[in-house]
Structure formats: C-alpha cells, structure tokens
Amino acid sequence: MSTNTLMSIHDRSRHILIHGLMLVMVGLLWGFVVPHTPHPRLALGAHIQFVSVGIVIVMMAVLLLKLPHHVGPKSVGVMLTAAWLIWPMALSEAANAWWGTTQMLPIAAGQAGATGGAVWQEVVMKVTHVAAGLALVAAWGLLVSAFLKKSAAAGTLNG
C-alpha cells in the first residue's frame, strides 16, 4: 500500500475512534436525562445504546490503529460510514423517550408503556435502525475478514 493510502486508513481510523469516544460521552451525559423523560425505560435503552455501541466503535478503531491488518481504504470507509450512521439511530432512540414508538423496539416499548408514535416517528425509528444495523454488520464483517486474512497469511488462525 502507498503512504497516502496508509495515511488515509490511519486518519479514517482516528475518525472512527473519535466517533466511538463521543458516542460514549453522549451516552454518559444522556444518563442524567433518563429519569426526566415521559418514557424513562426507552431513555434508558438510548443510554445503553450510546454507550455500548460507542465501546464497540472504540474497539474497532483501536484494532485498526494498533494491530497489523489487511483492511483496505474502502473497508475503512464502510466502517467510518457505519460510525456516522450510528448517530441518527441513537439520537432517534433518545427522541423516542418522548415519542413512545412501538414498532421498531416492541419489547422495550411494551415495558415502557408506550402507545405508539406518529407515522413519521415510527418511520424514522425503522430507517435509522435498519441503516445503522446493516452498516454495523457490514463493517464488523469486513474487520473480521481482514484479521482472518492476516491470520491465514501467517499460516494459523491464531495469528
């Protein structure tokens, strides 16, 4: 790989790290808001989402920045896109603490006593969750694949 490509991968990996760190920070701050919402159970879900997905993104970035791998620039682009797509999903969950939608997260909504949101709110929840979910699966799959390639090149699955 050229120096420019490596720099691009490194820069994008740092951006992924920043997304993860900020997701955790927003999640921690959001925790103070949880008891003051109409649906605190849904607000708690948003808090957990911000923090847990933020940690996953931090882990992804740390792996990219600190371990040898075969992740190319396009794959890192997918990973960065996934990090960006987490924001609308997590923010929609935070908004859902007021909306009370039921279609995307029916178990949590049932526990929260939510009765359903406006049609556009239900659509926002669905679109943001599906987009982020698919992007995260693709990003993590590319990450695993790149590390498996490295292990296979070394002649063992243990790298």
Which residues does each PLM region occupy?
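Individual transmembrane alpha-helices with interfacial aromatic-anchor signatures
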Residues: 115-136
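Hydrophobic cores of alpha-helical transmembrane segments in multi-pass integral membrane proteins
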Residues: 16-33, 44-64, 80-96, 130-145
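Calycin-type beta-barrel ligand-binding domains and close structural analogs
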Residues: 99-102, 106-109, 125-132
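Juxtamembrane membrane-water interface segments of multi-pass membrane proteins
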Residues: 1-15, 33-42, 59-80, 95-105, ...
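Membrane-interface interhelical loops and short amphipathic "cap" helices
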Residues: 32-48, 104-120
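N-proximal short alpha-helices
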Residues: 2, 6, 15, 22-24, ...
